[in-house]
């Protein structure tokens, strides 16, 4: 009886620990501190997409293989997402900003360390600058 209970407990722990995104993108679960945004002239290819790759797009959360979720794997996926998550020129109207700031629904990235203030400001600046594909 004790062995069966212990086995059931182990299975339950495995199931709970495997729920959510399929990979721990940042090995230690930490924030991607190696990505630093400038105050202005934010580059999608140098700053935004690498941040998405480390925190959102490639962990089974917002990648191309995950159905029914916003995909953050390319500029066109981000801009033409359904629902619309980026309103070019309007960070305060962008669901993406509201989610990473924790002002709408669950804070993103889900079950990971939040983005640091520089990264949040960088995403805001990128959107304010027109969410360019640069």
How should each PLM-predicted stretch be described?
Residues 16-20:
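C-terminal motif of bacterial Sec signal peptides marking the signal peptidase cleavage site
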Residues 9-15:
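Gram-negative bacterial Sec-dependent N-terminal signal peptides
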Residues 22-41, 45-124, 133-134:
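Solvent-exposed helix-loop boundary motif
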Residues 1-9:
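Bacterial N-terminal signal peptides that target proteins for export
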């Amino acid at each position: 009886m004790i062995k069966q209970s212990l086995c059931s407990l182990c299975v339950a722990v495995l199931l709970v620990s495997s729920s959510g995104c399929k990979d721990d993108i940042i090995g230690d679960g930490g924030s991607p501190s190696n990505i630093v945004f400038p105050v202005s002239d934010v580059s999608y290819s140098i700053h935004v997409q690498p941040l998405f790759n480390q925190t959102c797009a490639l962990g089974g959360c917002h990648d191309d293989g995950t159905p029914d979720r916003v995909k953050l794997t390319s500029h066109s996926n981000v801009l033409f997402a359904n629902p619309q998550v980026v309103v070019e020129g309007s960070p305060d109207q962008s669901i993406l900003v509201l989610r990473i700031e924790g002002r709408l629904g669950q804070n993103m990235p889900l079950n990971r360390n939040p983005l640091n203030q520089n990264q949040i400001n960088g995403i805001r600046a990128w959107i304010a600058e027109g969410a360019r594909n640069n």
